[in-house]
């Protein structure tokens, strides 16, 4: 009897070992493992450069590190965050960020929708207009900044040429703090309104023509048709375009730096990104800048996170 029991135990152990060997063999032959040489190295490098750098930045934001030597992790606190949140410069930069975020995104969406509706109606040369409107999107922030720097020039800029032709005095677009941020928003709108136009145009062309015909038969005006029937169906296009625009608004440092060629942008246009870089590279306040960078990351996650969660719930990820 004991011999029979031992035989059963040996048989069970053998079956279990064979099962594990089969699972291991299946795993080693899976596409995940076989493709590891192709995605593994990039993943490791990205993890070190991106996630490692982000983690290091987060860690030094709790210290008083000034860029020399090794950070002292013996006393970690929230002093840098407290200094930033109580600083007038930080609050002013955050307000400018908010104005840039809301103003730039809203106007781009409205203008892009208007242009998309015009092109969707099949106006003459619509394909050529579409190319012209989208062309600025292909330019880098540096090129756009230099182009608009010339256009904003007080003496020879094309904008002031128009202003003086109309009988008004030249405007110092970037030297006047009350309008400088508006000038920056104008330049960014010029660059990105074509992007929102293409997004909305794709959404409009996916809507069946039957809906337009039914609205026309019911006697609805063009304006009422778009406001009540068409625009509500562009919700997903609006959300996806808004997320992209807000992310670009948070990344406006490159544009502002290229506009003036230094860490200090025109008065009235300082944003959190320019403040962060200036305090780090000009004043050596690395821990303080790391705290600002962490808060910027939280803002970016606040923009992208809900969108990704929504896409996940809808099965889009």
UniProtKB/Swiss-Prot annotation:
Induction: Transcriptionally up-regulated by both L-arabinose and D-xylose via the pentose-specific regulator XacR. Its main location: membrane. It is found in: Cell membrane. One of its GO terms (cellular component) is plasma membrane. Residues 94-309 form the ABC transmembrane type-1 domain. The keyword Cell membrane applies. It comes from the Archaea. Pfam families: BPD_transp_1 (PF00528). CDD domains: TM_PBP2 (cd06261). The chain crosses the membrane at residues 40-60, 98-118, 132-152, 179-199, 241-261, 290-310. Keywords: Cell membrane, Membrane, Plasmid, Sugar transport, Transmembrane, Transmembrane helix, Transport. InterPro entries: ABC_transporter_permease, MetI-like, MetI-like_sf. Belongs to the binding-protein-dependent transport system permease family. The complex is composed of two ATP-binding proteins (XacJ and XacK), two transmembrane proteins (XacH and XacI) and a solute-binding protein (XacG). Part of the ABC transporter complex XacGHIJK involved in the uptake of xylose and arabinose. Responsible for the translocation of the substrate across the membrane. This is Xylose/arabinose import permease protein XacH. It comes from Haloferax volcanii (strain ATCC 29605 / DSM 3757 / JCM 8879 / NBRC 14742 / NCIMB 2012 / VKM B-1768 / DS2).
């Amino acid at each position: 009897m004991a011999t029979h029991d031992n035989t059963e135990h040996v048989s069970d152990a053998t079956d279990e070992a064979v099962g594990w060997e089969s699972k291991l063999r299946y795993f080693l032959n899976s596409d995940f493992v076989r493709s590891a040489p192709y995605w593994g190295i990039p993943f490791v490098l990205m993890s070190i450069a991106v996630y490692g750098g982000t983690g290091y930045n987060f860690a030094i934001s709790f210290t008083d590190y000034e860029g020399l030597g090794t950070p002292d992790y013996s006393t970690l606190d929230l002093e840098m965050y407290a200094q930033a949140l109580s600083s007038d410069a930080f609050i002013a930069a955050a307000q400018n960020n908010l104005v840039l975020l809301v103003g730039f995104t809203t106007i781009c969406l409205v203008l892009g929708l208007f242009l998309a509706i015009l092109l969707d109606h099949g106006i003459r040369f619509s394909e050529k207009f579409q190319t012209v409107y989208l062309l600025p999107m292909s330019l880098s922030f540096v090129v756009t900044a230099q182009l608009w720097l010339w256009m904003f020039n007080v003496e020879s800029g094309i904008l002031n040429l128009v202003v003086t032709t109309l009988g008004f005095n030249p405007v110092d677009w970037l030297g006047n703090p009350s309008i400088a941020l508006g000038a920056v928003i104008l330049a960014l709108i010029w660059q990105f309104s074509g992007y929102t136009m293409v997004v909305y145009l794709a959404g409009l062309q996916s809507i069946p023509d039957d809906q337009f015909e039914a609205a026309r038969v019911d006697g609805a005006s063009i304006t009422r048709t778009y406001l009540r029937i068409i625009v509500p169906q562009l919700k997903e296009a609006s959300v996806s375009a808004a997320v992209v625009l807000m992310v670009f608004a948070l990344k406006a440092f490159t544009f502002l730096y290229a506009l003036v060629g230094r860490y200090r942008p025109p008065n009235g246009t300082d944003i959190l990104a320019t403040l962060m870089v200036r305090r780090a590279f000009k004043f050596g306040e690395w821990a303080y800048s790391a705290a600002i960078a962490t808060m910027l990351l939280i803002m970016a996650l606040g923009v992208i996170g809900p969108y990704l969660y929504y896409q996940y719930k809808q099965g889009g990820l």
